[in-house]
Amino acid sequence: GIRTIGELAVMDLELLKRHLKKQGEFIWNYANGRDVSPFLRELPRNKGYGNSMTTPFDVTDRETAWQVILSLTETVCARLRADGMEAACVGISITDREFRHGSVQTTLISATDTTLEIYEAARSLFDRLWNHSPIRQMGVHTSKVSPKGHYQYQLFDRGLHDKYSRLDAAVDEIRKRYGEDCVQRAVFVENRIPHMSGGIDKVKRTGVTKAV
């Protein structure tokens, strides 16, 4: 004879459990506003890290597109490193002025979190994908992420990965202390493209707002 949630809330719990088993306890807790879901001590890890940007102008040349890719990669990699993660797959997406969309991705030889390695992969993908139509939105995305581990060196690496990693670590530390805008690449000085861009605020991507 239960017709309302209020009536359910004052029902005898043991009676409900006898008739409806575990489901009876579940709906009784629900009626009384009790959430008995397991408490998560940690948020689930990201399955991927990515950022996209709608440009305020049509991107019509490769060099400008590369700058947008670098700007997005700076943000993506800062987030990877802040979480102690690295990515084994890199992808890019392009939307042109006519809202036609394309995307492509590649798997890296070894997972990485360095800005320049992921940028080089994204730039190469862009050169394969772009058909020279004016671009209005671009995205850089990573997947196959895992906690940072041992890098698989390539035959002709010549220590570049370690150099890139030390450079990123130094820049991250300076930005953490003084704000992300205190260090930026020369290509972004007096440039209409911000040196770190994407649809996520500064606190979420680096934990930094400004110097104090």
Model segments located where?
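Acidic, metal-coordinating catalytic segment for phosphate/diphosphate chemistry
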Residues: 110-212
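DNA-contacting surface of Y-family translesion DNA polymerases
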Residues: 2-135
